[in-house]
Structures are given as C-alpha cells and as structure tokens.
Amino acid sequence: MAGRKGGRAKRRKVCFFTSNGITRIDYKDVDLLKRFVSERGKILPRRVTGTSAKYQRKLTVAIKRARQMALLPYVGE
C-alpha cells in the first residue's frame, strides 16, 4: 500500500493568541516575544508555532521593533 509509513499523526496547531484571547502584541513584552524566536535569534515560522496569519504579521512587527529598541537581540547567544 502506498500511503503513510506508520508514525505519528499530524496534530493541528492552535494559535496561541486566539486561544488565550490576546488581541494586542506589545513590543515591550519581551517574555512573550521570546517564545516565538529561535535560540539563534530568528523568528519562528507559522508552520512551527501554529500562529494565525494575522497574528504572525503583528508578531513580526513587534519582534522587529523590540530588536530596534535593543530589547531583543538580533542574533542568539
């Protein structure tokens, strides 16, 4: 049979912001932003985090603003 070769079934990721009722993403909330940045300092994509497109755009802007204000590093440690 040419199908799935056994393994884990894919689980649908849920948007963190929608499920927790967060409507505004503040660039000064560094603890929240760090959850969506890799250890190398790169912004994690939607397919990894499960964030909706609307909040991914807001998240990207907030992370870039936080980097500009030196609240987040451009590269990881």
UniProtKB/Swiss-Prot annotation:
The annotated subunit structure for this chain is: Part of the 30S ribosomal subunit. Forms a tight heterodimer with protein bS6.
HAMAP family given for it?
A: Ribosomal_bS18 (MF_00270)
Q: What is this protein called?
A: Small ribosomal subunit protein bS18
What does the UniProt record say this protein does?
A: Binds as a heterodimer with protein bS6 to the central domain of the 16S rRNA, where it helps stabilize the platform of the 30S subunit.
Q: Keyword check for RNA-binding, yes or no.
A: yes
What GO cellular-component annotations does this UniProt entry give?
A: cytosolic small ribosomal subunit
Q: Which GO terms describe its biological process?
A: translation
- What is the source species? Bacillus anthracis
Q: Which NCBIfam families match?
A: S18
Its domain of life?
A: Bacteria
Q: Which GO terms describe its molecular function?
A: small ribosomal subunit rRNA binding; structural constituent of ribosome
Query: A Pfam family in this protein?
Result: Ribosomal_S18
Q: Which gene encodes it?
A: rpsR
Establish whether keyword ATP-binding is in the entry.
Answer: no
Record's keyword terms, sorted: Ribonucleoprotein, Ribosomal protein, RNA-binding, rRNA-binding
Q: Name the family the entry cites.
A: Belongs to the bacterial ribosomal protein bS18 family.
